[in-house]
Amino acid sequence: MGFETINDLFSDIPDGVLRTGGLPLRGPQSEEEIWADAQHLLGANIDLDSRPSFLSAGLARNFVPTMVGMLATRGEFLTSYTPYQPEVSQGMLQAMWEFQTMVSELVGLPVANVSMYDASTAAAEAITCAVRVKNRKATQKGVVYVSQFVPPHRLSVIENYTQGGGIELRVLEHGIDGRVDLAGAAAAAGACAVYVEQPNAFGELDTGIAQLKEIIGEKTALIVGVDAVSLGIVEAPGVYGADLVVGEGQPFGIGPTAGGPIYGLFACSKEYLRQMPGRIVGKTVDEDGLDAFTLTLSTREQHIRRHRATSNICSNETLIALMGAMHMALLGPEGLERLALRIAAAAEATKQAVCSIEGVELADPDMPIFREFTIKLPGDAAAAVAHMDDAGVLGGFALGEWWESMSNCLLIGCDERTSQTDIDALVAALSSWVSEVSA
């Protein structure tokens, strides 16, 4: 490069921000000393296992059976080999195929891929996929309606995926009761797609979503984002006409883990098969008539036809998705139903307890909920969260961080690990704060 010293390499950095002295590093340490320092630094993190937690807003605290971790670390699965080459092992391919099968059964659609990065990228990919399939016959060319209650972090990803492709996003309005405005939804007929979430960002289940497909018609794709665990007790979107279903896979197989790694779910009807993103494993027979598994329709992908690929997804979440498949297999249909009922019961018990506090009210009292619910407080929700944190309780998510108009609203999330002791601690901490602000 023509440099004589290492300093020449950094000559374009302004003197005002260039560090010239040595780094403030300690001298050599023993392994024992390094471990002690590492533990001290890690102690600054908040461990969801160390205190009652009602934080959700996208990722869920969960219980992952020990068997999942044991199986996932076996050498047959945990390798440095990226599982998208055709010569990937039959065992890995079959495990991927089983994952697809379980996701397909879960959402009620015939086709699923081997995962996406997360729910947000899955939603964005579903929208672009729907536009590719529906735009030619759409009367509203390149238009997609998105629920006004999509969380801002997910909407941001959707906007990033669509803005360069000439896709116009319009808002699908909700009524003051939190439900989708079905009368207004008629305006979406003829668009490429409609994207809604069930439950929505407030944890509410909107029964009107089941009527959306009939309203928007067959020429417009219905995309539904789901809480995958809720499908143990809630009707599968494929039953009420969803064309594509996406969601966060994280509750199956892996904890929140500081935001990642996680994986997204993606399923669709056969109409979208050749335009869907990600890897697909197919089942066939070999020359001896034995079952064989293979990556199929790979020409959709960037490692085959970069200029014509349906998606640029590359780094793969397969190992994490297989952990989800292991978890789902261990649960089985009855276990999934019990898990969903347990979470629903915990949310209902927490809702009843919290709403018994004077000055606290439910945001939408007539809406059924799953996992999460939203309350209105007599003051700033962020202040309430800080107060409860000082009391040793992660009391939820202040929705003012997403929408300024909801600064007094608190999103409270529950899971299969929520206990009565946790609920009592939440009520005590929140009651203390309400008493202070109401004094």
For every predicted segment, state its role.
Residues 4-17, 242-247:
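TRNA-binding/sensing appendages of the translation machinery
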Residues 13-98, 104:
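N-terminal entrance/gating region of PLP-dependent enzymes' catalytic architecture
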